[in-house]
Regions:
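Mid/C-terminal beta-alpha module of Rossmann-like enzyme folds, strongest
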Residues: 2, 182-236
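N-terminal Rossmann NAD(P)H-binding glycine-rich loop of SDR-like oxidoreductase domains
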Residues: 3-25
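NAD(P)H-binding glycine-rich loop region in Rossmannoid oxidoreductase-like domains
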Residues: 14, 29-92
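Conserved Rossmann-fold NAD(P)-dependent oxidoreductase catalytic core, especially the SDR/UDP-sugar
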Residues: 26-28, 68, 74-119, 131
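C-terminal amphipathic/interface module of NAD(P)-dependent oxidoreductases
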Residues: 50, 237-275
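Conserved beta-loop-beta element that borders a ligand/cofactor-binding pocket
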Residues: 118-142, 147-154, 162
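A short C-terminal helix-loop "cap" of Rossmann-like NAD(P)-dependent dehydrogenase/epimerase domains
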Residues: 127, 152-164, 219-223, 227
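Substrate-positioning beta->alpha
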Residues: 143-150, 163-190, 194
Length: 275
């Protein structure tokens, strides 16, 4: 299958490109820069110059492909509304390009991106095999620059690793290589109009994460109140407090997906986070 991938040079995208090619697919990745194009060609993929705002390139990439995996997003949180608008237009353009073809369109769910999600779900009525994957809060592994590295940085700065209350609130996670396989399986076999939760760890007690960080940094671990969470964790205050279990039983059953890579706690213990 010839697959058009947005976000192909990103943290998850590079793993998805490798997973697709390893399983016999041909990949065309959207890229904005010469460096991105070189990264793709070095991996054995083709590069299509463009951006998420370049609707002509998105339409061409989708029309010339047998399927699309949409991972790209403009992470400009100072202009988040604009980023969401760009995503809606991009998703609309690509799903329109696949109309009445029966071809797959797999998108990652974005926080606050319900309008894009609705377009993907509606595309099932227009002859597109649209599906959405909502990944766990932490997509961990080598090269992670997300929430967990921020928790480690905060513990360094504060001199202790913290959890809120009794720390029983749960944090879902998935290894980036397991996520890559999940996107491939959805591309190959997801029914139209399906929404999947992509979690290997469906809910790790936040206290366990804090204790592992404290252990690896040789720092004390202590509880803080919910009122103090924002001051301690900054923008992560709410996420560090919420109970967010995300079961993936249906995902595993429908897509025959089984996580194979280290859990978040094992990755923290033996991975690259503290090198």
């Amino acid at each position: 299958m010839k697959v058009f991938v947005t976000g192909a040079t990103g943290y998850i995208g590079t793993a998805v490109v490798a997973e697709l090619m390893k399983n016999g697919h041909e990949v065309v990745g959207l890229c904005r820069s010469k460096e991105g194009a070189e990264k793709l060609t070095k991996a054995g993929a083709q590069a299509l110059k463009g951006s998420l705002e370049d609707l002509e390139s998105l339409e061409r990439g989708a029309k010339n492909a047998d399927g699309v995996i949409h991972l790209g997003f403009i992470h400009d949180f100072a202009n988040f509304g604009s980023s969401l608008t760009t995503d809606v237009k991009a998703v609309q353009t690509m799903t329109n390009a696949l109309k009445d073809t029966g071809k797959p369109f797999v998108s990652t769910a974005h926080a606050g991106g319900s309008a894009s999600d609705e377009i993907v779900m509606e595309s099932a009525k227009n002859g597109v095999r649209g599906s959405i994957i909502a990944l766990g809060r932490s997509v961990h592994g080598d090269g992670d620059k997300g929430f967990v590295p921020q928790l480690i940085r905060i513990a360094h700065q504060k001199g202790f690793s913290a959890f809120v209350g009794d720390g029983a609130n749960r944090w879902p996670a998935i290894h980036r290589l397991d996520a890559a396989k999940l996107f491939r399986l959805a591309l190959e076999s997801a029914p139209a109009g399906t929404y999947f939760r992509g979690t290997a760890d469906e809910g790790i007690p936040f206290r366990d994460i804090a204790e592992m960080i404290g252990k690896k940094l040789n720092l004390p671990v202590q509880s803080i109140t919910k009122d103090d969470a924002q001051a301690h964790f900054g923008f992560l205050g709410a996420l560090a407090s919420y109970d967010m279990p995300e079961p993936s039983k249906e995902t595993r059953e429908i897509l025959h997906w089984q996580p194979e890579h280290p859990s978040l706690l094992k990755d923290l213990e033996s991975g690259s986070y503290f090198n």
